[in-house]
Amino acid sequence: MTSIVEALVPGGKANPGPPLGPALGPLGVNIKEVVEKINEKTRDYNGMQVPVKVIVDDKKNVEIEVGTPPTASLVMKELGIQKGSGNAGSEVVGNLTISQVAKVARMKKEDVLSYDLKAAMKEVMGSCVPMGVNVEGMKAKDCQKALDEGKFDDLLAGEAW
């Protein structure tokens, strides 16, 4: 029987404590070894929470799947901030360029429901709203409308999905 443990861990800094240790202990695997593999695979996401899936088969073989961090974490990393606004309607904590939005959308390509770059960018902008993050100096909702109207088509002409 295969067991699956899913957890959100700090990139490159997972440890044998909760949530991994208590979940992996009963499965009889070498927790230290699993944690080292997770840290190796998540090193590029340092400072962000990263979803990981540890799959243990009945022969104690371990497979680790690493997801992408939540969109909010990627946006905060792009802006170099620690947290979003506590008062998103009136407090702005940062401003993304349209290229940064496209970059985050491409990073989330495997996780988003969108079939093209523009739609994925609108999903990213939707995550910016409750964080108090503007895009190109506009409220994220207004920037979504501008994107629909083709305002950024010339900037996105060379952007690949």
UniProtKB/Swiss-Prot annotation:
Q: Which SMART domains match?
A: RL11
**Keyword line:** Ribonucleoprotein, Ribosomal protein, RNA-binding, rRNA-binding
Q: Which GO terms describe its cellular component?
A: large ribosomal subunit
Please provide, alphabetically and separated by semicolons, the GO molecular function terms listed in this UniProt record: large ribosomal subunit rRNA binding; structural constituent of ribosome
GO terms for biological process? translation
- At the top level, the lineage of the source is Archaea
Question: Quaternary form?
Answer: Part of the ribosomal stalk of the 50S ribosomal subunit. Interacts with L10 and the large rRNA to form the base of the stalk. L10 forms an elongated spine to which L12 dimers bind in a sequential fashion forming a multimeric L10(L12)X complex.
Sequence similarity? Belongs to the universal ribosomal protein uL11 family.
Listed name of the protein: Large ribosomal subunit protein uL11
